[in-house]
Amino acid sequence: MFLQVTGTATPAMPAVVFLNSWRRPLSIPLRSVKTFKPLAFFDLKGGKGMSEFHEVELKVRDYELDQFGVVNNAVYANYCQHGRHEFLESIGINCDEVARSGEALAISELTMKFLSPLRSGDKFVVKARISGTSAARIYFDHFIFKLPNQEPILEAKGIAVWLDNKYRPVRIPSSIRSKFVHFLRQDDAV
């Protein structure tokens, strides 16, 4: 039932034992992975739809750089998260309050396309918007542009899933859904 242990065990460092059933994850070819198509969960006729971006201006800090003097790729996920949270807060959804209630809005997928690097002191804008929804998911688009010339830096797509207190996907609560509908139906003149 157990594999042979490699190395020797010491009192300070016990040997690690793997079950025979442990297997390396299989690689799935990209062509076999299903792509998602967001469902039209909200009736958005007559509103500005999902074209409105929320913008947040930021500045690169020295500790966000890698050994090559550019922003580390992992930091861009933080920038996108900040943009999403600011966007949600602007329409009346506070992520901290959601967490305190025992529920969560968690990113299940985030795909990023890096177009150009940012360096220390660069000013940039993160643009976030809702691109679609389903019963339990919210689809986001994110863009990062360097200021002042609006040079494209990053394009990202994310899927956020509404989770209950056991971290299982559930329908987006009607109180939250109504905030999305209110925002998305606002007239362009407002």
Curated annotation (Swiss-Prot):
Name a GO CC annotation attached to this entry. Answer: mitochondrion
Q: Which UniProt keywords apply?
A: Chloroplast, Hydrolase, Lipid metabolism, Plastid, Transit peptide
- Name the UniProt record assigns to this protein: Acyl-acyl carrier protein thioesterase ATL3, chloroplastic
Active site per database record: 66
Which Cys residues form disulphide pairs? none
Reading the lineage from the top rank, the first entry is: Eukaryota
Any one biological process term the GO annotation gives: lipid metabolic process
Per UniProt, subcellular location reads as: Plastid, Chloroplast
| Transit peptide (residue range) | 1-49
Q: What is its main location?
A: plastid
Gene name for this UniProt entry: ALT3
Q: Which family does this protein fall into? A: Belongs to the 4-hydroxybenzoyl-CoA thioesterase family.
As for what it does, the entry says: Acyl-ACP thioesterase involved in the production of fatty acids and beta-keto fatty acids. Can produce fatty acids of long chain (14:1 and 16:1) and beta-keto fatty acids of medium to long chain (8:0, 10:0, 12:0, 12:1, 14:0 and 16:0) when expressed in a heterologous organism (E.coli). Possesses thioesterase activity for lauroyl-ACP (12:0-ACP) in vitro. May play a role in the generation of long fatty acids in the chloroplast.
Enzyme Commission number, as recorded: 3.1.2.-
Q: Which GO terms describe its molecular function?
A: fatty acyl-[ACP] hydrolase activity
What the entry lists under InterPro entries is as follows: 4-hydroxybenzoyl-CoA_TE, HotDog_dom_sf
Q: Name the enzyme's class.
A: hydrolase
Which tissues is it found in, per the record? Highly expressed in stems and flowers and at lower levels in rosette leaves, cauline leaves and siliques.
Transmembrane as UniProt keyword: no
